[in-house]
Amino acid sequence: MIGVIGVKRNVDIAIREKLALYPKKHKKYVGELLNSFKEVVILNTCNRTEIYFNCTEEISEDEIFDKIFNVFNWNDDLKKYMFLSKEKRAVTHLMEVICGFHSRILGEDQILGQIKDAYKTAISDNSISSELQKMFEIAIACGKKFKTECKMFEVPVSSVSISINSALLKGCRKFMVLGYGEIGKLAIKHLLSHKVECIYLIVRDKSKASDLEGEIVEVLDFNEKNQVINEVDCIVSCTAAPHTVVRNEDIKTEGDIIHIYDLAVPRDVDKELSEKERVILKDIDEISKIDDKNKKIRKERMEEYKHIVEESIEEFLNWLKIREVSSKIRNIKIRENEICSERIKTFSNKGNGENAKLAERMIKSTADAYVNRAIELLKSEALKGSDSSCAEIIEKIFLT
């Protein structure tokens, strides 16, 4: 059984923080999950916590919740904020997620790269091997095709772009970016495409961003951030830290207005900062509610290309159906080879060499024609969901 358990949409950030997973514990999580599930993929982003699983035995929904909650040491009171989808609903969920239909900012395509990373990590961890591997391969192809054909780049959107565009409209020209992961890199790229006065990039390893040092970008270590934090108009924070990185005492009470966009989950910025008159603080939930002129265009365009999602769902479900009869197909081919060998051996004992070779080709060709037709019929009936009676007849003909 294939399934996914994750945080429901529109759950408040205060709850999502409690369900966030820490990357440093990833190996431990996977090892423990594989004690209960055949395959596992963990999708853990700043806005999404989802565990995709495949189990060979039928287990109840309560058991699934208990097993996963025990691994992550989550409080049982948080179960009401989680969803569980199985079989086709789980497949549909992944295909829609990778195309941006479930993103807090509709159409945000960063999720495609995040799912690709989760898949690569699962391959590296040896935590997927069959159904989940195929499902993610089809999903990634679906996401790429959707992104290419939908051409969402013509209507750009992300939490980063919305945050920075909002700050620029408010007159911000001096920026600080905290963190240089995927989101941090997007923030820097976006800022460099606009006329800003200066950018302070705060990182834990300055060597990873040394190529950015230039006229308007200054790379600083985290312990240097407070030297300049009160000089900027805007802070964009997007670290993967499990703790607060911008504390209340870091920002002086007096001074010019400072806009802070906290894109992290758990939150990077002390929420008490919003009580200071000079601070305008927005977390990821508030950022996703900022209306932008492209929202309606994105929604209409995505619906127009929804057929790509539906086709990918059907492709995977058909693969599953064919896979269910694959063992029967293998047995039929094995039996075909055995029968051919017996007939060829019998003929060879009676005829000369030249005739024997010709007979071998004829026997094999005739057997292939009938067996391949039987296999085609079996596959066709499997796709219709009526393969059991067909398989029974074919087994009686070829395997008894």
Curated annotation (Swiss-Prot):
Annotated catalytic residues: 46 (nucleophile)
Its EC number(s): 1.2.1.70
Binding-site residues, substrate: 45-48, 103, 108-110, 114
Residues in the signal sequence: none
Catalyses which reaction(s): (S)-4-amino-5-oxopentanoate + tRNA(Glu) + NADP(+) = L-glutamyl-tRNA(Glu) + NADPH + H(+)
Gene3D superfamilies reported in the protein's UniProt record: Glutamyl-tRNA reductase, N-terminal domain (3.30.460.30), NAD(P)-binding Rossmann-like Domain (3.40.50.720)
Pfam (any one): Shikimate_DH
Record has Iron-sulfur as a keyword: no
Example GO molecular function: glutamyl-tRNA reductase activity
Domain of life assignment: Bacteria
Key words of the record: NADP, Oxidoreductase, Porphyrin biosynthesis
Residues the UniProt record annotates as site (Important for activity): 93
Chain sites annotated for binding NADP(+): 179-184
Pathway it works in: Porphyrin-containing compound metabolism; protoporphyrin-IX biosynthesis; 5-aminolevulinate from L-glutamyl-tRNA(Glu): step 1/2
UniProt cross-references to InterPro entries, sorted A to Z: 4pyrrol_synth_GluRdtase, 4pyrrol_synth_GluRdtase_dimer, 4pyrrol_synth_GluRdtase_N, GluRdtase_CS, GluRdtase_N_sf, NAD(P)-bd_dom_sf, Shikm_DH/Glu-tRNA_Rdtase
One BP annotation, GO: protoporphyrinogen IX biosynthetic process from glutamate
UniProt free text on domains: Possesses an unusual extended V-shaped dimeric structure with each monomer consisting of three distinct domains arranged along a curved 'spinal' alpha-helix. The N-terminal catalytic domain specifically recognizes the glutamate moiety of the substrate. The second domain is the NADPH-binding domain, and the third C-terminal domain is responsible for dimerization.
Other information: During catalysis, the active site Cys acts as a nucleophile attacking the alpha-carbonyl group of tRNA-bound glutamate with the formation of a thioester intermediate between enzyme and glutamate, and the concomitant release of tRNA(Glu). The thioester intermediate is finally reduced by direct hydride transfer from NADPH, to form the product GSA.
HAMAP family with a match to the protein in the record: Glu_tRNA_reductase (MF_00087)
Function, in words: Catalyzes the NADPH-dependent reduction of glutamyl-tRNA(Glu) to glutamate 1-semialdehyde (GSA).
Family indicated by similarity: Belongs to the glutamyl-tRNA reductase family.
Subunit structure: Homodimer.
Protein name: Glutamyl-tRNA reductase
Organism encoding this protein: Clostridium perfringens (strain 13 / Type A)
Lineage per the UniProt record: Bacteria, Bacillati, Bacillota, Clostridia, Eubacteriales
